[in-house]
């Protein structure tokens, strides 16, 4: 990192910088880097940009592409490109920095990033709303957003996910043993009065929608949420994580179909979600000890059934993890031909020799 400029609020960094280190450096100056993937303490900013990582604060601040001013990129043909600029607005040419954000490394090598920083809100609370049913929990986020509470995060953990992660961390949390789900809501404010008002408003709204308890959580709640993937890996080294995304008003429609799919394919699944932006992680776990070949065939069949349902609701198969090679076949099946042709044309124009991450995102051979 080459320094924070507090006037225009950028910070310049090379792509190997750990996301959590970037967050902590900004915080030293009373500033916030809003990109916050659950892997912040291990993921690098270059990977965040290339994958357009989302994370816990995307409800308020957007994904990684919303956090960048500019990129330095080495193209497949050896040119060095400065894409974007440290400007608040620009209508000059194409937004090339946005082309490379989320491109999964197939268009060039990102070497430097100029990211946006924001003033750090001095007041923050984390509220856990406890629900007995998934349906009640999934109905809350849209109502929070419509109420004008302006949350930073709205996260969901079902009871299976809570039990698994609490066991992994040897942690006790309220109502987990009662079979309940959590909706975790973070709200940032610049005044104590505003924070208090929003806390009261949130509690009232949660109770109106079936919450059996609301409690202000300490930092353990984010440890619980962010260690979920490690807990899953402890149970099943071959675990698969889905991260499909649907419009907010379609969350109840798709989540009602998950139990049907679980039963149809005889899958044990746990679910967490960045539910405030419609990004849902359903993790099938190989609880019955199938061979790798049997397991991956079952997951492929599950995908072939799940993704068309997601697209029928106006969603996409990935909200933040990307396509890579694991979802390459399904991406080609679900994506309109005109869209695929544009992606292939861009890839061929920038990488005529197909040397950048071949076989990922799109197949051009």
Language-model-derived ranges and their functions:
Residues 160, 275-278, 317, 322-329:
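Small/polar glycine-rich anion-binding or flexible loop at a beta-alpha turn
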Residues 311-323, 348, 352-356:
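Alpha-helix capping/hinge segments and adjacent helical runs
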């Amino acid at each position: 990192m080459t320094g924070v400029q507090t006037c225009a609020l950028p910070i310049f960094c090379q792509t190997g910088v750990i996301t959590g280190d970037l967050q902590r450096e900004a915080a030293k100056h009373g500033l916030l880097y809003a990109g916050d993937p659950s892997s912040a303490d291990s993921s690098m900013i270059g990977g965040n940009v290339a994958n357009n990582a989302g994370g816990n604060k995307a409800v308020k601040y957007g994904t990684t592409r919303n956090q960048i001013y500019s990129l330095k990129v080495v193209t497949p043909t050896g040119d060095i490109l400065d894409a974007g600029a440290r400007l608040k607005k620009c209508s000059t040419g194409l937004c090339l920095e946005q082309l490379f954000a989320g491109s999964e490394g197939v268009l060039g090598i990102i070497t430097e990033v100029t990211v946006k920083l924001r003033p750090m809100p001095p007041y923050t609370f984390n509220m856990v709303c406890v629900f007995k049913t998934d349906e009640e929990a999934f109905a809350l986020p849209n109502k929070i957003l419509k109420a004008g509470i302006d949350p930073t995060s709205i996260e969901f953990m079902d009871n299976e996910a809570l039990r698994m992660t609490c066991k992994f961390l040897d942690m006790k949390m309220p109502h987990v043993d009662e079979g309940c789900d959590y909706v975790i809501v973070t709200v940032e404010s610049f005044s104590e009065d505003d924070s208090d008002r929003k806390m009261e408003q949130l509690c009232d709204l949660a109770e109106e929608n079936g919450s059996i308890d609301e409690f202000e959580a300490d930092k353990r709640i984010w440890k619980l949420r962010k260690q979920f993937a490690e807990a899953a890996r402890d149970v099943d080294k071959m675990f698969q994580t889905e991260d499909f995304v649907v419009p907010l008003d379609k969350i109840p429609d798709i989540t009602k179909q998950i139990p049907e799919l679980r039963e149809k394919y005889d899958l044990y699944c746990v679910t967490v979600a960045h539910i405030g932006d419609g990004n849902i992680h359903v993790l099938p776990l190989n609880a019955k000890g199938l061979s790798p070949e049997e397991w991956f065939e079952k997951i492929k069949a599950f995908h072939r059934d799940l993704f068309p349902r997601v697209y029928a609701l106006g969603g996409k198969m990935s909200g933040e993890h990307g396509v890579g090679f694991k979802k390459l076949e399904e991406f080609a099946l679900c994506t309109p031909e005109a869209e695929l042709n544009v992606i292939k044309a861009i890839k061929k124009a920038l990488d005529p020799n197909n040397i950048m991450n071949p076989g990922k995102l799109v197949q051009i051979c």
